[in-house]
Amino acid sequence: MAPHWAVWLLAAGLWGLGIGAEMWWNLVPRKTVSSGELVTVVRRFSQTGIQDFLTLTLTEHSGLLYVGAREALFAFSVEALELQGAISWEAPAEKKIECTQKGKSNQTECFNFIRFLQPYNSSHLYVCGTYAFQPKCTYINMLTFTLDRAEFEDGKGKCPYDPAKGHTGLLVDGELYSATLNNFLGTEPVILRYMGTHHSIKTEYLAFWLNEPHFVGSAFVPESVGSFTGDDDKIYFFFSERAVEYDCYSEQVVARVARVCKGDMGGARTLQKKWTTFLKARLVCSAPDWKVYFNQLKAVHTLRGASWHNTTFFGVFQARWGDMDLSAVCEYQLEQIQQVFEGPYKEYSEQAQKWARYTDPVPSPRPGSCINNWHRDNGYTSSLELPDNTLNFIKKHPLMEDQVKPRLGRPLLVKKNTNFTHVVADRVPGLDGATYTVLFIGTGDGWLLKAVSLGPWIHMVEELQVFDQEPVESLVLSQSKKVLFAGSRSQLVQLSLADCTKYRFCVDCVLARDPYCAWNVNTSRCVATTSGRSGSFLVQHVANLDTSKMCNQYGIKKVRSIPKNITVVSGTDLVLPCHLSSNLAHAHWTFGSQDLPAEQPGSFLYDTGLQALVVMAAQSRHSGPYRCYSEEQGTRLAAESYLVAVVAGSSVTLEARAPLENLGLVWLAVVALGAVCLVLLLLVLSLRRRLREELEKGAKASERTLVYPLELPKEPASPPFRPGPETDEKLWDPVGYYYSDGSLKIVPGHARCQPGGGPPSPPPGIPGQPLPSPTRLHLGGGRNSNANGYVRLQLGGEDRGGSGHPLPELADELRRKLQQRQPLPDSNPEESSV
């Protein structure tokens, strides 16, 4: 058994040969497991009307998983994903109406999205939701799992207004540390502290403090524990923002890490109720040799060790390289981040009009540092006692000169044409005594990648399709129960970290190099390492590259496959499939006792797409036994075995199959196809009959319809009509006789004529649309009467010469128009639509 340090020596040698990039650039997972193959090993939860399982909070001591979704909260048992409780917390209808009136979508935004859910104390949870763009917070009783609806708190600064905006938060000793956007428009980014014994404190609204950030994660590190300098605990925030220090490109986005001290009280005069310990630095994740820089930080996971000194951060990044999407995972050590925050500052030079390293003397006490033993010895027991020169300096210099670089100086792995969304990590002890870090990475198309860190490179164990074309929105891992939870838009899933049953053979189990799995010699099964710890009965070697003898040295029998009998006609092109054990294996064929070359023109050809050996124009000399081995890292695993017999006859093309292997499926497909054809035939006949009936009805209706020419009765000669004051409102009601554009409606019927003299009085004005007093009605400007059967009469202005009686002129013009109008095919032709 090779020692663990041998991995590092081998990696260094490979890197010197220039092939190290193959161990982290676009790695291929060894196994691909589709969603159909996960049916028996994955538990799922979904509920009608419930969406966006965004917030997952695990409490190991109680064995419960708390889930925040859209307008709902759930409690599940960690072991079996059994529902323990559910709460409906919807935004009121009036809040949703206000949200839509402000221009937000009532389909995707105007709901109560749960964005913060964490334990407040031993008996209550603290929960915050967007509440239709009016954030609210309240408490949940953990014992009864009920929501306190009597005391909703304002969620401003604790939860984002917009569910699509980045947010992160922590509850530490009853104090809420939150990074979010502090207003409806999302223009006030803030990192603040609420609740608890201290008063509220937040960042300055300055572009060089926070500039359009997208917050993705936060972490509490108890650095006061065991500190020889009396240091304070710290809270770290991770985000992307538009960089201010690059004058060449103002739109440059970079990844950041910022930190504040838990005991920060703000300044006495300068920076009152503002952070005095806020510092930030750039997170670098790049492949300089390929000129690829990952600046879009998407998620961060904090992996804690036995001591806070061993804290590790894993970041998920995205980038665009030409026309290709790239994703990467970078690893950062807490010690590296601390060194950057203790280094030089960056400042904006007014004279040079650019950002540069600050080279002048730094004030004392050091700006941005936490209160420690040195401060106390010099009379500074609180940030309220810090001098103004220190506070003014940190107000103008929150950005550090040095950058936080990843371990190894490059990404752990890079994947092309993939968007990573989330990552979680676990430390697993191997049977060789080493501890391995296993990463679980969610993707934008619903896959979960499982990878193990082997010193300077990564081994991709497998890829699992946990969701069908839905992004992995959230991930959380239970180290005590060894299960993983993943949330998407429509469902929540639980899967075991140690799914070892898929490996049926010793070689396959060992080659998986999965720290959770080992081969049990006694039971001849691949089992989880937690089920048995006796090294003499379990076979596992994660770091060893040469596993060819691992199974043989324990006397494990090789797997033998039963040959399939194939009889073909001479001259036939024969296709012999070979199902490989993994994506990293390649096929090795033998004929008789001889190895077959990868390609022999005119005789043998291996088709990588079909993963099959093609025997072209088989002859009698091709009769005999064929064996296919799945070869991986020098180890051969029997995959397929065929016994071929070539007989004389006409030439056809055959593919090797087991006898009657899929005959039942063929008959089932034939019956199903016949049923579909019958249903389609009946549907066509039914539609044809309906169409014929409709045509007959239309013909009968047209025969019964008579078209009568419409004639307007002639008006008797009478004096001009002068409406009286009593009937003026009725006859000139603007609602009944005017269109919205001022046109007059002409409705069939006879108005009551009353004697009177003089021109008619003008109608009352329409609000917002004053009309001139009409003295003439013009039909020429009306809409096309042939289009809809209506005649629109415009009200004229002043009389264009001459006086006369308008009603006879109206009757003549209207009669001409009606005679020209085409009759409409109406069911009741006596009823005019003029």
UniProtKB/Swiss-Prot annotation:
Disruption phenotype: Partial neonate lethality, due to defects in brain and neural tube development. In about one third of the embryos cranial neural folds fail to converge, leading to an open neural tube and exencephaly. Mice without exencephaly are viable and fertile. Residues 21-664 are extracellular. It is found in: Postsynaptic density membrane; Cytoplasmic vesicle, Secretory vesicle, Synaptic vesicle membrane. Residues 557-645 form the Ig-like C2-type domain. One of its GO terms (biological process) is cerebellum development. Interacts (via the PDZ-binding motif) with GIPC (via the PDZ domain). Interacts with NCDN. Interacts (via the PDZ-binding motif) with DLG4. Interacts with PLXNB2. This is Semaphorin-4C. It comes from Mus musculus (Mouse).
